[in-house]
């Protein structure tokens, strides 16, 4: 009898211990989930407020320097918001995952035009200036075509492996230098409105820096904690990479362009996207490739490249006649993006 009682006691003790362990696990998991949700909210607050300060600082900087806001959008804003793509590319190349670099840039460029400009135009109708339609948007098309030609060497010779070589990287850098020269030439034009800058140049640049730090920190918090929440809810790694991670590097461009559109800073909103796309190809691809080494194209799909070119051409066609992007054009871009992304998720 004593042995039987002892066995029953041991079984009950084991069950109680297992139950306690399970409840403790759920409790800790619940706390982690709450912390992740709170940090996710903090991330979004930092993103939105950071973008707000960033746009104000960029606009004031343009007025202080007596240059057009488009130039500031194409340079300070675009290069600042493209920092995540650049960081991802450098890390990928140094770790030997060079095939990630191309996907990062192409995916970001497609998302920038179709999704970000699409969403931004829903918030406010964006007037596009003649110079942007005739010069800056065609430059985006040119850089997209250039990357496609340099990526697919076997178009011309079936025996060649698709690789973006160091020479290709130097070529894209040279094209980017020409782009910078073009920006320098148009930067001489004074701002058309003759507005007074709301802040002095020092404070304006400080706002740009503070805003950018807020955007980058907010982006990291959103991506990290959204991923943690998704994993806790048993969302697959593939779905996380196709959604949260893929959109993560473009969050700075998204919040900056949306905030700029809401403030009717159209040149900053559009310049940010055009400048980011050119920067992604000229610097994010060109510089690491020229300095570190080749980028393997691997089995990268032609459809993705042609979608990138098509998105740039679509932007030109939508703005050529009316010289603006409104809700109608925005919905067209969003619809095309949904179709393309559906293809990507299904596995194309």
Which stretches of residues belong to each language-model region?
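Polybasic, lysine-rich low-complexity intrinsically disordered segments
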Residues: 2-3, 7, 17
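Hydrophobic alpha-helical segments, chiefly the membrane-spanning helices
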Residues: 4, 12, 22-348
């Amino acid at each position: 009898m004593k042995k039987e009682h002892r066995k029953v006691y041991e079984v009950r003790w084991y069950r109680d211990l297992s139950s306690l362990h399970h409840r403790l696990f759920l409790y800790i998991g619940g706390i982690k989930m709450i912390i992740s949700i709170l940090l996710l909210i903090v991330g979004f607050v930092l993103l939105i407020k950071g973008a707000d300060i960033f746009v104000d600082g960029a606009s004031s900087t343009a007025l202080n320097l007596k240059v057009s806001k488009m130039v500031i959008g194409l340079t300070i804003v675009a290069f600042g918001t493209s920092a995540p793509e650049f960081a991802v590319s450098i890390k990928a190349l140094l770790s030997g995952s060079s095939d990630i670099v191309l996907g990062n840039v192409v995916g970001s460029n497609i998302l920038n035009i179709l999704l970000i400009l699409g969403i931004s135009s829903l918030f406010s109708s964006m007037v596009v200036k003649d110079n942007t339609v005739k010069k800056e948007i065609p430059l985006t098309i040119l850089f997209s075509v250039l990357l496609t030609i340099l990526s697919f060497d076997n178009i011309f010779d079936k025996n060649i492996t698709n690789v973006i070589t160091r020479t290709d990287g130097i070529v894209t850098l040279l094209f980017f230098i020409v782009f910078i020269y073009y920006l320098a030439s148009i930067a001489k034009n004074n701002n058309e409105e003759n507005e007074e800058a709301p802040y002095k140049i020092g404070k304006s640049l400080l706002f740009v820096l503070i805003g950018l730090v807020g955007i980058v920190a907010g982006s990291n918090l959103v991506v990290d904690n959204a991923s943690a929440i998704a994993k806790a809810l048993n969302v697959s790694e593939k779905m996380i990479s196709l959604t949260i991670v893929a959109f993560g590097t473009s969050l700075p461009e998204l919040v900056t362009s949306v905030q700029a559109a809401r403030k009717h800073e159209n040149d900053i909103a559009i310049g940010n996207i055009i400048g980011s796309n050119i920067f992604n190809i000229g610097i994010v691809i060109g510089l690491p490739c020229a300095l570190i080494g080749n980028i393997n194209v691997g089995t990268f799909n032609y459809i993705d490249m042609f979608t990138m070119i098509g998105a740039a051409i679509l932007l030109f066609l939508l703005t050529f006649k009316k010289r603006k992007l409104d809700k109608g054009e925005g919905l067209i871009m969003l619809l095309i993006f949904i179709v393309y992304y559906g293809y990507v998720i299904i596995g194309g």
